[in-house]
């Protein structure tokens, strides 16, 4: 099987091919079609087998498709996504939310958060979708600024996520996709 046979959207397929990947790994071949059908999965595979792509590619596909549907549904005179007015803390002052977080990937360490963020950069570079990683051990301000600009996909460690939810910097009411990466490791950490 090839990535082309998985019916991946052209912008994502182009990015995957640019990375030099033609054939999915076993976890990708098993997981991607299931997630693309909107089903939940529980995946276990060794390190280095492509687990991140197994969830990143279908998430990108779903969000890209939803964006295309939203654009097609807008009146012809306003074919740009509406931007709600926001106050200094990034809160919306209009009826329409702009770039609400729709996917959350929770991971135990900053190193994993950065690796996952890099994968979304690589596979999503032609989609127009925005993503960022938030994690502790660094100043919050640069991370909250990225959040205020709007992100579709958030990669986070539990501690920083809880901090920013408590400060009303992260809102998850528009979430459609949730991934626990390395869930066993997070449970071991408490």
Give short role names for the model-derived ranges.
Residues 1-44, 54, 61, 181:
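Conserved pre-motif I regulatory segment
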Residues 34-35, 146, 170:
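Conserved alpha-helical segment in the helical subdomain of ABC-type ATPase nucleotide-binding domains
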Residues 49-52:
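Conserved lysine of the Walker
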Residues 58-66:
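Conserved structural elements of the adenylate-forming
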Residues 114, 188-189:
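Conserved D-loop-proximal element of ABC-family nucleotide-binding domains
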Residues 158, 182-183:
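Walker B catalytic acidic pair
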Residues 168-169, 189-190:
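Short, conserved "post-DEAD/DEAH" coupling segment immediately C-terminal to helicase motif II
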């Amino acid at each position: 099987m090839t990535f082309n046979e998985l019916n991946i959207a052209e912008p994502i397929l182009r990015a995957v091919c640019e990375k030099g990947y033609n054939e999915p790994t076993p976890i990708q071949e098993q997981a991607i079609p299931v997630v693309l059908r909107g089903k939940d999965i529980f995946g276990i595979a060794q390190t280095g087998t492509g687990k991140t792509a197994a969830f990143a590619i279908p998430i990108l596909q779903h969000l890209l498709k939803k964006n295309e549907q939203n654009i097609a549904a807008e009146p012809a005179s306003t074919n740009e996504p509406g931007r709600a007015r926001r106050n200094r803390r990034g809160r919306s002052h209009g009826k329409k939310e702009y770039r609400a977080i729709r996917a959350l990937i929770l991971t135990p360490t900053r190193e994993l958060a950065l690796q996952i963020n890099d994968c979304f950069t690589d596979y999503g570079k032609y989609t127009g979708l925005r993503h960022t990683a938030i994690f502790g051990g660094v100043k919050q301000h640069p991370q909250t600024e990225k959040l205020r600009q709007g992100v579709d996909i958030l990669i986070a460690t539990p501690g920083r996520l809880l901090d920013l939810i408590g400060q009303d910097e992260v809102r998850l009411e528009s979430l459609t996709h949730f991934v626990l990466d390395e869930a066993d490791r997070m449970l071991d950490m408490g």
